Amino acid sequence: MASWPPLQLQSSNQSQLFPQNATACDNAPEAWDLLHRVLPTFIISICSFGLLGNLFVLLVFLLPRRRLNVAEIYLANLAASDLVFVLGLPFWAENIWNQFNWPFGALLCRVINGIIKANLFISIFLVVAISQDRYCVLVHPMASRRRQRRRQARVTCVLIWVVGGLLSIPTFLLRSIQAVPDLNITACILLLPHEAWHFARIVELNILAFLLPLAAIIFFNYHILASLRGREEVSRTRCGGSKDSKTTALILTLVVAFLVCWAPYHFFAFLEFLFQVQAVRGCFWEDFIDLGLQLANFLAFTNSSLNPVIYVFAGRLFRTKVWELYKQCTPKSLAPISSSHRKEIFQLFWRN
């Protein structure tokens, strides 16, 4: 069966969904065959690591019987969002393995893609909120009160989940399954009702979900870095640096990883829009955009499994929390004993 690139599985009306010359640009059959065979395995691996990693992060944050600080509230919500997201990846992997033949019905077609779309918004809005909180702590420390920030963080997270869900409604409503008799498949497609929806979609996807948040992230983190440079001399006098500096270093790493993982997706999504409105044409652009979108999707998926790794390797305070949780959950009989206590036990054992 010939490959059917995703660009041709998305259109503004039924007559344009499967053009007669659709196979004229099938210039990369080997690349598509390799993608169908290899990419699902990588996606399942991401799902496994993301599921275990984000569950672990949530357990570390939520099991101890104490209130979360502001940064932990945001990071726990980010882990929860990633966890919900990776649960939908096996369906995506099976879809690619079947060469875009969707076997799960219309409801799951809408639900899975709606979850993916909601995660896109929730994740980047949480990154903005985290950056804004660090900005307030480091740049305007006198204006931020801990109790007020904690309450604000909870409200902000609830609003982000609600807004992310609302922004995913168009995807939920416009996704549908469509039979393709020529290829003997049933595809899960985004069926746009009018040409104007292409513009609305790119405004939502590239501007609302990336460029505007990116501008806010750059603004906040530029001032954060400037503030950290100003405190460099003070930090050198402290052993290991301040707690705020450690938390900020972790968050900056998360921000950079998020942008690296998601920027290619938005780049190819914009190229897809240009192709849809025929600003760019030709078989080269079609194959380049189709294959690029699949690889960019994969790179974006990795962000959900990469965050727990960043917590472990870049988050010194997170590692401390893991150790505290381990000591809390380990029975006292299994806890490590001091050398002096061990010596006393040894002497008592051999004493007659």
UniProtKB/Swiss-Prot annotation:
Glycosylation site residues: N13, N21, N184
Location relative to the cell: Cell membrane
Q: Which residues lie on this side of the membrane: Extracellular?
A: 1-41, 94-110, 175-206, 272-294
Membrane topology summary: Multi-pass membrane protein
Residues that span the membrane, as ranges: 42-62, 73-93, 111-131, 154-174, 207-227, 251-271, 295-315
Q: Is Chaperone a UniProt keyword of this protein?
A: no
> A GO molecular-function term, please?
bradykinin receptor activity
Q: Among its keywords, does the record have Aminoacyl-tRNA synthetase?
A: no
Q: What is this protein called?
A: B1 bradykinin receptor
